Structures are given as C-alpha cells and as structure tokens.
Regions:
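Fe-S-dependent hydro-lyases/dehydratases of central metabolism
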Residues: 1-467
Length: 467
C-alpha cells in the first residue's frame, strides 16, 4: 500500500469519513460541468427538491456539442440546442459560473480550468468527462465521473470512492528532437497496456517531466485514463507555481504565499512507498502513431504494423479485429499510410504550445491535395492568443481551416465528423471504432506536429524529416 505520496496526502486531507461499504467519502474541491453529462443530474436534483450545495465550487462551460464553424443560435442540431438551453437554465437557476460562447472564457473544460487558474495543486477535482485526469498535471487528484456521480457532487460536494494504489512512472532524460509529450504517453500506454493501470493512480516523475512545461504535463496526464488509470498526476514544482501566478482564480498576495507552502508540503516524500514502479528512458521514446483501435496499439512511425506472432497471445484477438477494421496488414509500414482528414485540437493537444509546434511544420508548406485539415483551438483564450501571434495566418496560408473553440472531431458530437471509411491523423486521445463520427471511420493518434506533417505529405510521415 502506498504511503507518503502526493496521492495519499491529498486523499487523506479530503476524507470526510469511511462508509460501511469500505469506500471513502471524499470532499471535492472543484466540480467542472458541461452540457452533456449535467442535464440529467440537475433533473434528478429537481425531482428530489435538492439544490446545489456549493455553487461557488462549481464551474460550467459548453464544449462537446459546440459547432466550430457556424455558432449562430439556435444551433442547426436540435439536440445540441436543447443541451445549450438546459445548461444555461441550470447554471442560472443555481448561481453557477457559466462560460458561454463569446464570453472570452469558453472552451474545452480541461483547457479553460487550468488557464484560468481554477485548477490548483492539492485539490480534488471531478467532472463528468473521462479526461478529467488532465488536471493532475498540477498535483491535483482529478476524477472523471458519470452522471449519477455528477448528481452526488452537486448535492453533497462529495464522492464515494475506493482508494487507488499508486504506480510511480519514472521517465528520465531529454526527449529527442521530434518527440513530444504525446509520444511519451502513447509509449507508456503501448508498454503497460490499456488495462495496465486499472486500480491505480499514476504518479509521473523523473527528469523528463521536470523539463516539461505545464501544457506538456497536461497532455500526459490527460491520457492516463487511456492506460486504465483512474487518475494521473505530477508533483507540483516551480514550473507549476510560475504557470499559476497571476491567473484569474489563483491566490493573490498573502494567500499566494500560504498556498505555496501548502503546495510544497503535499509533494511525495523522498522515502514514499509505492505499490509499483516502472521506469522509461526518454532517449528511447520515438515519434509514435497508433495503428489499431485502442490507444495501446501504437508503434514508432518508422515501424511496421506488428504481426500476431510478435504479440502476447492475449493481444492477438483484438489485433485481428484491428487489422480488419483499419484495413492495415501485419508487417505493413505505418509510414506512407494515406490520410484523408487531419485534426489538430482537443483537451489533449489544443493548447498554445501544441499549435506553435504544428505551425512550425505548416509554415512555408501546403496541405496535400485531397486532404482536409483543420485546427481547433482548445479555448477562446487560446484562439485569441494564437491569432495575436499570427498562427492562424500561418495555418490558413498552408491550407488548414482555422476554427472556433470546442471539442470538435475528438468525439464528433458536433458537425465535425469523418465520412464513410475516411482515415484521420488526429491529435486527440481515442481511436475507438466510430469515435470520430463515422461508424466505419478510422483514426490514427499522434502529436500535433505529426498531424501537421501528415497534412503536408498526405500520408503518415516522420515529422523529423520536416524539422
């Protein structure tokens, strides 16, 4: 059992009590909500005559169903418009902060909370979205939850949870040129598997993470859930504090100094005990691309689709399904695979540093004939900052479409969808069957820079050849 880790310290400091089931009743410091998983939760509160207990600890935005082109109301999609009206009504009725379209603060929930300073070290955070683990980059313990749990947090500001084990994932060294945070987490998931983290929280540590920016750390923690871990986190340090200082909701004045003292105290102890430890060498991590139908089916961009005999016996059945669905043959090079659509964005890779790296590849080049490529900033703030730097002009000159903020084609609950058997190069987090809007559409996950390279070449391409 882990002891002396950040996870233990934050968990213990937020424990309200132990339940007869053996679970912990955990206080939730920040509850983030959006338009998809909150309407039913609010309806259940109304049915029981309950109010939101701590509206000041609840923040809402719209992201999943938001069009990234025509955002005029009412939306063309009736269901999307209904969801918009519901979250507008629910937040107004309950006195909850709501970052609506055009407010300057709207965007993907896991992008806007950090950029506003809402996400802070030592917090417990919940959201009705799988990728809530993103916020662990700040040294928070953040859980994705279902609609019934959204209801519970709204009503009681607590969750009933079983305590997780803690796995230390140590990555040391400097990443090679052309290798990014996205490659790090895809490599980890490829190695440990999509179920390898079940029952665990992942603590990401080592000199590689110390060298990362906060946005890079967010990319890694975002996809901890794809490796089966309920949450992932990085211990807060000077990089964390510098990022937070001066942001809208960050502590100010004397409160800032008090916060720093607390944040430093929750760092995992030097002699902390872990339930498992895994180590990686940063120098050995390549630009990585998924070839199959889970984020764990990944290979280096210069490798071939693995053959069944190269796999563990338990992985072969899923691989056979992936070969058929993706129309890729064992032994086939992934480089050179034709691409139809290129998507840069999402809560994984829709931040400024992601757009800057992609723009470096796009600048002075042009999207290949027959390829549809578009860039979706993770928030309205990111969009404005990118435009101030001229990134929009670089992308547009290269033939990319420049869109409004939203989840877009990460999950296609909006107009941005694949058509038929199209195959996409995507900077998002999931490559499940039908994930991007077409029941037969195919997705290859990779870093934003790799997506930009694929857009230019028209095929999966090693980004290092364009640097």
């Amino acid at each position: 059992m882990s002891k002396g880790t950040l996870f233990d310290k934050v968990w213990d400091s937020h424990t309200v009590g132990m339940l007869p089931s053996g679970q912990t009743q955990l206080f939730i410091g920040l509850h983030l909500i959006h338009e998809v998983t909150s309407p039913q939760a609010f309806a259940m509160l109304r049915e029981r005559g309950l109010k939101v207990l701590f509206p000041d600890r609840t923040v809402a935005t719209v992201d999943h169903i938001v069009p990234t082109e025509n955002q005029a109301r009412p939306f063309a999609d009736d269901m999307a418009e209904t969801m918009m009206q519901e979250i507008e009504r629910n937040t107004q009725d309950n006195g909850i902060i709501f970052h609506k379209i055009g407010s300057g603060n709207q965007g993907v929930v896991h992008v806007i909370a950090p950029e506003q300073g809402l996400t802070q070290p030592g917090m417990t955070i919940a959201c009705g979205d799988s990728h809530t683990s993103t916020h662990g980059a700040f040294g928070a313990i953040a859980f994705g939850i279902g609609t019934s749990q959204v209801r519970d947090v709204l009503a009681s500001q607590t969750l009933s949870l079983s305590k997780l084990k803690v796995r230390k994932i140590e990555v040391n060294g400097t990443l090679p040129t052309g290798v990014y945070a996205k490659d790090v987490i895809l490599h980890i998931i490829r190695t440990l598997g999509v179920t390898g983290g079940v029952g665990f929280a992942y603590e990401f540590t080592g000199t590689t993470f110390e060298q990362m920016t906060m946005e890079e750390r967010m990319t890694v923690c975002n996809m901890a859930i794809e490796g089966g871990a309920r949450c992932g986190y990085v211990n807060p340090d000077a990089v964390t504090f510098e990022y937070l200082k001066g942001r809208d909701f960050a502590p100010k004045g004397a409160d800032w100094e008090k916060a720093i003292a607390w944040w430093q105290n929750i760092h995992s102890d030097a002699d902390a005990q872990y339930d498992d430890v895994v180590a990686f060498d940063a120098a050995a991590i390549p630009p990585t691309v998924t070839w199959g139908i889970t984020p764990g089916q990944g290979i280096a961009v210069n490798q071939t689709v693995p053959k069944p005999e190269e796999m563990a016996e338990g992985d072969r059945e899923l691989a056979a399904e992936a070969y058929r669905y993706m129309d890729l043959a064992p032994g086939q090079p992934i480089s050179g695979t034709k691409i139809d659509v290129c998507f840069i964005g999402s809560c994984t890779n829709g931040r400024m540093s992601d757009l800057r790296e992609a723009a470096k590849i796009a600048k002075g080049r042009h999207v290949a004939d027959g390829v549809k490529a578009f860039v979706v900033p993770g928030s309205e703030r990111v969009k404005l900052e990118a435009e101030a730097e001229g990134l929009d002009k670089i992308f547009e000159a290269a033939g990319f479409e420049w869109r409004e903020a939203g989840c877009s084609m990460c999950l296609a609950m909006n107009p941005d969808k694949l058509q038929g058997r199209q195959i996409s190069a995507s900077s998002s987090n999931r490559n499940f069957k039908g994930r991007q809007g077409s029941s037969s559409g195919r997705t290859l996950l990779m870093s934003p820079a790799m997506v930009a390279a694929a857009a230019i070449a028209g095929t999966v391409t090693d980004v290092r050849e364009m640097l």
